[in-house]
């Protein structure tokens, strides 16, 4: 690779004693974006359960069952705390019940039955005894939960038992989706990601077309995905006889399974999402990193009239599009963000058209894209300038009383608060100074005794978001809270390897299940380490 093939950003700084060579780690991360063009995301308990149930013919079946058995919590459930556990617990309980009913389950029957019974016991407590924690705003939960409960009730009904639906759910939306699919009509692309909820209507549904994967690296167009989802792909293929090995959707499933060793993520490929987030976090922190020109060209090529989806099989969305545009601008490849106007509503920008709900982080990312574009545009751009004013006001109005933001795409308020605070700091003007100060005060007030930050416990990811807020904003006093930064840096340094890889990386991002996008999170952590190393008065502090 020649010098002309690279775009170098940032200025080099030599690491001191005890520090991580962040620039070297960033180079390795960027190389991984090229080497793994589908992206890297954590395995999903929910999605893996669906493959156990829907595709016992798929290679790696026994490994998937073992993955699920090992992940059961002491209380009988699966997944993260609070209401996040409902969907994975339903998925695994149904999957292992289906495994028990097979003639040759391949596992010790009494042990498997005990695992299922513990899962059912917790589900009865949640759903029939009304002890279910409040449910988070997760994609398709209003379809997934009724579908899985109906399947489990099919087993329980033989003994005169059943599980109730969560409060506020009646299954009407699920019935409508299934009826539409059965009619042969096309369905919105965002629903295809959760096609498995449709049951028999999903099998070879005429209104659903596989999406070829062939635009990145050497990937073959003979590989195709259904909604970028292994579960959706398995549902479309059906649970009967195994399809031909060369069938494009089966090729996709086999490729994912082979890459992960059995268990599967909720979504793959996530090419544009991963690259946009990772590169923008690295660049915003000022890390010196060489970005191959081909990577930049791929991001440019991904942007069409409607923007870009996170990956093949998913709908285009304002979040992926705005982050890609922002990353490109930071890398010197400025594009007019006019495709984002498609997502403008009367008050804000939606993730996709027809969205039920609203997202502060999506609007913060649109503000980043518009604001960075205005820094480069040679003349007046009144429409963009007016949108920046509206977005900053909208974000300020959605700040919580204590100074944080919450969002529908991440479990942690530290992610949402970092996105919104940094956008307002950079592009919100003087009118946003108070909102930024309130966010900083909230971050300082919620630091844990060990120097970390986190919703349920301290994590490297959430600590990194907090450090970005403290180090990339200017307090009203003009001073930075360096004692909090020092404590946060000590925690972060002790939580990662010498290459800046977190020892523990819990999934905190919202999809059908919580997931971890590896490269974006690692980029955020590297950015925080780099900023802290530059700000602390003594190397190694």
Predicted regions and their residues:
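An alpha-helical repeat/solenoid feature that recognizes helix-turn-helix modules
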Residues: 1-21, 36-63, 80-110, 125-193, ...
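Helix-turn-helix repeat elements of alpha-solenoid scaffolds
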Residues: 22-27, 335, 343
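Buried hydrophobic core positions in alpha-solenoid tandem helical repeats
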Residues: 29-33, 68, 119, 123, ...
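Short Pro/Gly-enriched beta-strand edge/turn motifs at strand-loop
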Residues: 32-34, 214-220, 506-507
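Nucleic acid-processing catalytic cores of prokaryotic defense/repair systems
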Residues: 73-78
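Edge strands and adjacent loops of beta-rich recognition modules
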Residues: 192-217
């Amino acid at each position: 690779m020649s010098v002309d093939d690279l775009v170098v950003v940032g200025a080099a700084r030599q690491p001191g004693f005890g520090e991580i060579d962040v620039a070297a780690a960033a180079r390795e991360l960027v190389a991984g974006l090229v080497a793994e063009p589908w992206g890297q995301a954590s395995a999903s308990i929910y999605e893996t359960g669906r493959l156990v149930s829907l595709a016992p013919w798929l290679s790696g079946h026994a490994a998937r069952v073992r993955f699920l058995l090992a992940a059961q919590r002491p209380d009988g459930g699966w997944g993260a705390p609070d209401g996040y556990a409902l969907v994975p617990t339903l998925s695994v309980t149904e999957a292992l019940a289906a495994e028990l009913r097979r003639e040759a389950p391949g596992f010790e029957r009494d042990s498997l039955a005990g695992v299922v019974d513990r899962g059912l016991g917790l589900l009865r407590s949640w759903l029939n005894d009304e002890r279910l924690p409040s449910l988070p705003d997760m994609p398709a939960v209003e379809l997934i939960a009724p579908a899985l409960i109906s399947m489990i009730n099919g087993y329980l009904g033989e003994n005169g038992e059943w599980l109730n639906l969560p409060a506020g759910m009646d299954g009407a939306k699920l019935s409508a989706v299934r009826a539409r699919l059965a009619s042969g009509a096309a369905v919105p692309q965002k629903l295809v990601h959760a096609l498995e909820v449709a049951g028999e209507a999903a099998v070879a549904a005429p209104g659903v077309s596989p999406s070829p994967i062939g635009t990145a690296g050497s990937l073959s167009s003979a590989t195709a995905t259904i909604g970028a989802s292994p579960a959706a792909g398995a549902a479309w293929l059906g649970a009967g006889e195994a399809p031909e090995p060369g069938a494009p959707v089966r090729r996709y499933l086999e490729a994912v399974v082979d890459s992960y060793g059995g268990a599967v993520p909720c979504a793959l490929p996530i090419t544009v999402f991963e690259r946009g987030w990772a590169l923008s976090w690295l660049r915003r922190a000022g890390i010196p990193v060489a970005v191959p020109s081909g990577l930049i060209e791929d991001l440019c090529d991904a942007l069409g009239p409607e923007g870009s989806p996170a990956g093949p099989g998913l709908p285009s969305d304002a979040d992926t599009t705005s982050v890609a545009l922002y990353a490109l601008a930071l890398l010197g490849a400025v594009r007019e963000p006019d495709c984002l106007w498609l997502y403008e509503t009367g008050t804000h920008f939606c993730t996709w058209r027809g969205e039920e709900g609203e997202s502060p982080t999506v609007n913060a990312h649109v503000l980043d894209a518009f604001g960075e574009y205005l820094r480069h545009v040679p003349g007046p751009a009144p429409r963009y300038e007016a949108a920046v004013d509206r977005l900053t006001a909208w974000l300020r109005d959605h700040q919580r009383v204590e100074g944080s933001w919450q969002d529908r795409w991440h479990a942690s308020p530290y992610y949402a608060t970092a996105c919104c605070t940094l956008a307002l700091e950079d592009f919100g003007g003087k009118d946003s100074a108070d909102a930024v100060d309130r966010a900083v005060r909230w971050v300082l007030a919620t630091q844990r005794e060990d120097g970390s930050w986190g919703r349920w416990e301290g994590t490297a990811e959430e600590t990194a978001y907090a450090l970005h807020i403290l180090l990339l904003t200017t307090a009203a006093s003009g001073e930075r809270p360096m004692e909090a930064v020092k404590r946060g840096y000590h925690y972060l340094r002790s939580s990662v390897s010498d290459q800046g890889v977190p020892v523990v990386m819990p999934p905190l991002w919202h999809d059908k299940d919580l997931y971890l996008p590896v490269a974006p999170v690692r980029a955020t952590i590297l950015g925080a380490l780099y900023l802290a190393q530059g700000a602390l008065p003594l190397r190694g502090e």
